[in-house]
Every structure is written in C-alpha cells, then in structure tokens.
Amino acid sequence: MQPGDVFSRDPEIMSGALVFTGTRVPVDVLFESLLGGSSLDEILEDFPSIGRERAEAALRLAQRSLHSAAA
C-alpha cells in the first residue's frame, strides 16, 4: 500500500488533519490508542472504517520512517 492509500489530508475534512483515506478518522487515533493500551482489534472495533489492512499499513509505514530516520 502506498501512503496515499493509507492516509490523506484535505482542508475540508477534519480541518486538514491527517486522516485514514476515505474516512474522517484521524491517524493519531491509531497511535494514541495503542499507546493507551488498546489492542489493534479493540481499535478496529471502535473504528471499523479504518480496516485492518490500512491500520497495519500505517504501522509498517511508521516503522519504515523510523528506520529511515535512524539511518
């Protein structure tokens, strides 16, 4: 999945916050919920529009970004 398939930003949607593409769910919800102790299954239960494939792709993209930053 390409980043544009996972997240997008549009000034008309959630005041331009980074959201999961095709939703109004901010990407921060995923990371803040994980940091708060929620499991991925719990997050997807609360925000089913994210979808498992997109959530896992977001985590992989974040991981790659960290590896690139550390290189």
Task: Report each predicted region and the residues it spans.
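Long, charge-rich, low-complexity alpha-helical segments
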Residues: 25-71
